[in-house]
Structure formats: structure tokens, C-alpha cells
Amino acid sequence: MLKIVLRWLLTLVYRVKVHGLENYAKAGNRVLIVANHTSFLDPLLLGVFLPDDITFAINTQISERWWLKPFLRLSKVFPMDPTHPLSLKALIHHLQSDTKTVIFPEGRITVTGSLMKIYDGTGMVADKSGATLLPIRIEGAEYSRFSKLGSVRQHWFPRITIHIQPPTLIETHGEVTGKARRKHSGHILADIMTEMMFATSHYQQTIFAALLEARALHGGRYTVAEDLERKPLSYDALIARSIFVGKLIKTLTQTGENVGVLLPNSCKTLNVVLGLQIYQRVPAMLNYSIGAAGMAAACRTGQINIVLTSRKFIELAKLEDEAATLAQHVKLIYLEDLATSLTSFDKIIGLLQAKTARFWYKSQDYDADDAAVVLFTSGSEGLPKGVVLSHANILANHKQIRARIDFGPGDVVLNFLPMFHSFGFTVGTMMPILNGMTSFFYPSPLHYAVIPEMAYEVGATIMFGTNTFLAAYAKKAHPYDFYSLRYVVAGAEKLQETTRTTWLDKFGIRILEGYGATETSPVTSVNTPMDYKAGSVGRFMPDMLHKLEPVPGIENAGKLHVAGPNIMKGYLLPDNPGVLVPPCSAAFGEGWYDTGDIVHVDEEGFIHIQGRSKRFAKIGGEMVSLTAVEQLAIHAWPEAQHVVVSLPDPKKGEQLILLTTRRDANAKQLADASPGVATINFPKKVFVLDKLPVLATGKTDYPGATALAARLLEGGNADSD
């Protein structure tokens, strides 16, 4: 009777909903229920809303607390001392009696809002007892007054949902025993819990709908964005201004039209992007570092007729010539001109629409699979293509990242990566504003002395960058400039050991290396504080599938193909403008994206990149990794920059060319510094340069480097092997 009353009361107060009760019925009789631990309400919620008479495995000390005893009478309790190994054995025997038992594998209430440490012992209990695992996510209770989250806006009566996931088993290899088996089962359990967190997240919606949810959760006055103008934007202001801009652009464009955006990292750019999305226009982010011809080509590929820009930006960035040339191909619309047409009445209506957006926006016909943005690939390995990402792609990647790392309210992201780059768009911009974080926009990553000062000034806690940029900042920064940083994540190019050790020694910060591509929205994998292996790029994001295509001449690695909810909607190709080409791997078919990277995935699931498939040379019938040869040069001369490319060779098929900034570099020195390395792995020619070709994103410009090497080879003046 008490259980019925409490169920009615909790449903009334917290509007509790239970999803997946059919999974509970499928689990059988011997069941270990594993749940995330969000608040002091969790045992009560599970005891009241789960069928049957379940048992709670609970810490002996906690079970003795007076305020908890009345609630424990609702269910059976299995007290256990986590410091005593016999407690786990007793729990195994208890489960083998065909009972349904609840345990919280984190061992404590979360203080991050994300999963905390998962104890291996819980996985071992499931493994050795033969019990079915039933993962359950409690969502919403972390925002109640009964949680331990100090950085979030707490509510008296938040909406709570209990997600019951499909039952599963922990299956370990028979040859694994002892501590290794315990660790392995704990590893499997952690993956199950992480997959649960993602599977129960809501990413099948539009970005603006997710933004409205974030405002409801964190409050309309919460500061979510800021730039060099130092006029912080709250959720209310961001939504209102985005509606203002969107309504003005709506009259000039058509539904579904790709609209060019030629603007720097700023709050105004964020307003433009969201404004376009609200009214079902697609922002196409133009890379202003590639010149007028490159931008015009991108506009042709994306069938872009209108480009939004700013006179102030064009002047400050000295892009007058590029703008004049671009204006011959498309219509340039300046934000300053749009602003003059905004009347007081428009502002009043816009403010009302912003306040009531959660009502009128839901009634609109929006699809999460509609295009949300067009990003143009950097062209590091060929001609740039338009990559179309849907709302669901971007939100899925956001939720995947959140399932792995505890980014959350209170964090300040210093975002200097341009929004025309997928890293800067999804991770630096969209993830923070949808997650109650504050994104501070800085217009250029190339200001190596200024950015450390900005990190110090704004108290940045999160920073994303490439190896090139992070290495440059480390040289310029004071040891205390990055005092407030919790996490620094590197991607887009290989993190060099010198950069890793410099950050650790000078700032006490361990860089987390990740991996991805524009086509994966962009994060494919990342090292995390709890799942880290130096030299790797981390483990795959939740709900991502992968296959390795064998490559002749390469052992213990293959070409990586991936599939998942964050895989792009499709390409816009230069030879077929405006026509969407869905992802399709030649090896594995539709829905699979061929990354073109040669990788090794170890037994723990960590990815080790060997290089691009195009970054291998075939010399005398042997496959040689250009990336591996670059690493030899980096090891020999860590203070310099190096690029290795391959060019045709009449005798051996291909030859290696090293471009370096090391003044006295030559092939003999490199060979002397690399004992035991086969001669085939050394460059045939070495050219010394003042600087190497680099793209605006910080990645090496390999096509540019190859073309430069060909010109230098033709002209001579190189050190030979």
C-alpha cells in the first residue's frame, strides 16, 4: 500500500515516466540491475517504480543512516562492505539464488553530472554469478534538490525519467583469469553504462529545440556566449537575437536554401547560424583563408547565391579584394545593412517570440535529419568538398562526447578554432551552448601570444586545439596562464610527444588526444580522464561501428570505415553541384564512411593511427608510412617542423622527400639518429625551408607541400641520401 501511495506522490511531484518496462520482463529471474547514481532519490525511485520485490546492495555504513531506514523498508537490503572481498562473494551467492538485485556501480552520487568511476567489482559479480545485466538510467534527478551537483541550476520538482535498457550479459574470454578477468569485466560494464547514457539521450531533434531545452534547464539569464566585445549573451538574449536575424534573412531566401556565412568567431556569427536554422535555412560556413577563388568554388559546389558577411570584419581581416571578387559570383549581404531595417516593432515581436518559443516552435514541421550546416573540407588530401551535417548528426556527437567526458555547467570554453572547421563548429560552439557551458569566441588561432593571455583572463576551463597551435601557445605562455584549465583536447593532426611533454612539464596538464573528421561531425574517438592511453587517439564514441579493410603490405592494421548516428548526411561534390551524395563505402556499402586512415585497434579498443592510406609510399614493392618517417625526423630534431611527401621515382616507383625547418638537416644525420631503421624509411632528398605549408586550421597542407617538393626537386639544391 505504501509503495502505491509513494508511486502516486512521486508521479505527481516529479512527473516520473518509466520507459522500457518490457526489458525488465525480458531479463529473467537472476538479474543484476546497474543504475547511474544521480541523487539521494535514486533508491526510492527504483524501489517504487520497478516491479517485484527487488534487493538493494548497499554500503553497510550508508544503510545505518537514520534518515534512510524508513525507505529501505520498501525493499530488501543486502548490506555489504566494499572494503571486504568476502562481501562480493556473498553478493554473487545471493544472485545465484535467482534474485533481482540493484547496485550503483559508481559507488557514490555523481558530482559531475556524468558517469563517474565504474568499479570493476560490479562487473566481476555479474560475470561470476551468471546474472543478466539490466542497465537503467535515471534522468532528471540530478537537477533536484537531492543531488550533489553544485554547478547546475537545481529545481524543486524536475521531470524524472527512468530508462530501462535491453538486458545484456558480461562475457569474458575463458582464458582470462584472476585480476585480469576482473579488470576486463569492469571494462565491459563501463562500456555498457556509457552506451546506456548515449542510447537514452535525446538527439533526434533540431539544434534550436535542444537550445530551448538547455534554456529551460539552466535558466534564461545564464551566460552562454561571449566574445571580444565583452557583452555576454544569456540564453534569452541569444535566442531573441537569433530570431531577429533569422526573420530578416527569411525574407531574402528560400526554405532549405544554402546561405553562405563569411564571418569570424563571434556572438554575432552564432546568432546568424542559429537564425538561419530556426527558419530552415542552411548555414554554409566559408573558409576565408583559402582566398576568393576557393570561396567562389565552394559557393558553386553548394549552390550558394547569397553570402552573409560584415563590413567591419572585411575591413579588419583585410579581405576587401576577396570580397570584391566574390561579389562577382554571389550576392553579398552585410549585417550592418540588415540591422538598419530592424524596427522597434520587430524587436518587440521578436522578444515575445523568444519568450514563447517553446510553444510555437514545437508546432512547426521540423525534421532532425534536415541539413543543419554545410562545412567544406580543408582539402588536406585533395579538392575541398561540401559536407552536409544534419541536426541529428551534430546533436548525436554532442551526446556521445557527454557520455564520455564530464563537460558541463560552470565550464568556460575558449574557442579560437574557426566555425568553418568542424572542430570549432560542433565542439567549440554547439556543444557548450547546448550544455550550459560558456563559449568565449576568439577570432583567430594564430595569435600565439594573445591566446594564453585570454585563457588566463576569462578563466577558461576547456580548450580544444591542434598540435600546431598547442605547441605554439606553450612556447609563448607564462606557466600560470593556463591555471584554470581542466581539460585540453587535441585533434585534427597527430599530437607530438614534444607537445605532450611540454604541456605536462610546464603547465601540469595532460593533453587528451582525439580523432575525427568533418564527416563524423567531427569526433570519432577521444582519450578521457578515465580511459586514457598515451600515443593513441582514444576509443570509439558510443554507438559507433567500425570495420578495418585489409591493405596489402600492411600488417596488424587496416583502412578504417565507420558508421553511426554522427556520420554525415552526405557530400556536395564539385563535379555535381548541389546534389547530395550519401555516405557509401566501396568496401562495406551505404551508411559507412571510409576515413582513408590506416589504423590499429588494440585489444582494449584504443585506436592507433598509422597514417593516411594516401600517406603511404610504395618503394621497390614495400609499403612505407610517410607519417612514420615524419616521426623519425621529429625524434631527431624535435624543435623543428617536418613534412614528408612522396614523388614518382623512375627506378623504385616512388621516393621520399623531407621538407624541414631544421637548418643543418640532412639524410645522414637522420639515419644516425635512427639506429636500427631500414634504409628504405629515409628520405632520398631533404629540403630546408623557413616555414612549411599549413592550412588555416593548423593542419599540414599536404597538397601544397607535395607541389612545393616537386618544384624544389626540379630546381635541385637539396641534400641527397
For each predicted feature, which ranges?
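AMP-binding/adenylate-forming catalytic core of the ANL superfamily
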Residues: V307, G564, K569-G570, G596-N681, ...
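Conserved AMP-binding/adenylation subdomain of ANL enzymes
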Residues: L395-V412, F420-I462, K476
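Conserved C-terminal "lid"/linker of ANL adenylate-forming enzymes
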Residues: K331-E336, A617, V645-P648, I657-T661, ...
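Conserved pre-ATP/AMP-binding loop-to-beta segment of ANL
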Residues: L332-L335, A339-F376, L383, D406-V412
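Gly/Ser/Thr-rich phosphate-binding loop
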Residues: L335, G350-L352, A460-G465, A474-K533, ...
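Structural core segment of the AMP-binding/adenylate-forming
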Residues: T251, I278-G350, G459, I657, ...
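Conserved ANL (AMP-binding/adenylate-forming) active-site segment centered on the GW(Y/F)…HTG consensus within
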Residues: G508, Y532, N566-G596, S613, ...
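Conserved ATP/PPi-binding loop(s) of AMP-dependent carboxylate-activating enzymes
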Residues: R539-D543, P552-A586, E622-V624
